């Protein structure tokens, strides 16, 4: 088994398929229209992705999550999923999306081998949502596609980043809404990923604050948590679930078994990394991956208060 310096195994590969997105969420994407995104010719091809996934599977990876940017901007997404689904050792393929372009491609994604979908929804209020994503989004259509995905047999979850003073007044509304839909909602503490989001700890709504608020309206119980789980999960009395990803106040670095591959072929051993490792141009890719992982000692979230405010990779380049 391939282990890093803290004896953590490599089990999950997150692939950013593009750094582009149709939205401009304040906590993720650069503002304005002039940002110099990667030219399409520099993006990993389906053939390259398949080649790399085969190597990662050989080294112990069992799960692949496709992210962005917005992965549905890739016209060859279905081909990519189909290729990954045929790789021996890969047990699960998931997709993270804002859901805007999902409706027309659900069936094809299912046929290609996609098993799980996570949709990002940060507000139920159209005006407030527009302030966050800086685009007009038909939330009704996003909710409809979530329901449709569930009907087609996808395992569906919703992620909501909670920011103090912005959408923390919607915590119970979000919980109530997705509980009624029978969809697992995961609240995410506002994180200091990258440098474009003007992050400050005062904007963080902690897991404890969320739980104390939830207890005022709902009865629920904690579910067992494995060291590698990112989410603290809870079950309501009716069997529906919700979770909290508390990277800021309750770090889970010690169990982190994930590596990230950017859209142009660079490996990042942590969401908060300040540099990537160029897999694309490595001659012996298998040994390159081994050495990168063996040398890994990241635990940024555990050391956040001790770390310097150095420039970190932006979220839209490596996925959340």
Curated annotation (Swiss-Prot):
Annotated function: Catalyzes the cyclization of GTP to (8S)-3',8-cyclo-7,8-dihydroguanosine 5'-triphosphate.
Originating gene: moaA
Cofactor (UniProt): [4Fe-4S] cluster
TM stretches of this protein: none
Organism: Aquifex aeolicus (strain VF5)
Biological processes, Gene Ontology terms: Mo-molybdopterin cofactor biosynthetic process
Keywords of this entry: 4Fe-4S, GTP-binding, Iron, Iron-sulfur, Lyase, Metal-binding, Molybdenum cofactor biosynthesis, Nucleotide-binding, S-adenosyl-L-methionine
This protein's name: GTP 3',8-cyclase
CDD domains: Radical_SAM, Twitch_MoaA
EC numbers on record: 4.1.99.22
């Amino acid at each position: 088994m391939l282990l890093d310096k803290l004896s953590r195994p490599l089990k999950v590969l997150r692939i950013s398929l593009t750094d582009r997105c149709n939205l401009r969420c304040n906590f993720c994407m650069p503002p304005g229209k002039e940002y110099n995104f990667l030219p399409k010719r520099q993006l990993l091809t389906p053939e390259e992705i398949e080649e790399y996934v085969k190597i990662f599977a050989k080294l112990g990876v069992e799960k692949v999550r496709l992210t962005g940017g917005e992965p549905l901007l890739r016209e060859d997404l279905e081909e990519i999923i189909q290729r990954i689904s045929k790789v021996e050792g890969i047990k699960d393929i998931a997709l993270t999306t804002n859901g805007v372009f999902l409706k027309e491609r659900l069936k094809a994604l299912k046929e290609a081998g996609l098993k799980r979908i996570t949709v990002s929804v940060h507000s139920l209020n159209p005006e407030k949502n527009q302030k966050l994503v800086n685009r007009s989004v038909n939330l009704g259509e996003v909710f409809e596609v979530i329901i449709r995905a569930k009907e087609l047999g996808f395992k569906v979850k919703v992620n909501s980043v909670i920011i103090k003073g912005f959408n923390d007044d919607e915590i119970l509304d979000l919980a109530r809404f997705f509980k009624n839909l029978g969809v697992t909602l995961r609240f995410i503490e506002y994180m200091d990923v990258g440098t474009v989001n003007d992050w400050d700890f005062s904007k963080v709504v902690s897991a404890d604050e969320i739980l104390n608020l939830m207890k005022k309206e709902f009865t629920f119980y904690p579910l067992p948590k494995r060291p590698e789980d990112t989410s603290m999960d809870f079950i309501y009395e009716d069997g529906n679930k919700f979770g909290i990803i508390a990277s800021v106040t309750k770090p889970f670095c010690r169990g982190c078994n994930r590596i990230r591959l950017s859209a142009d072929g660079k490996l990042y051993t942590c969401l908060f990394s300040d540099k990537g490792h160029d897999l694309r141009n490595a001659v012996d890719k298998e040994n390159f991956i081994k050495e990168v992982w063996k040398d890994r000692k990241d635990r940024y979230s555990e050391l956040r208060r001790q770390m310097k405010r150095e420039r970190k990779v932006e979220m839209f380049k490596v996925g959340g």
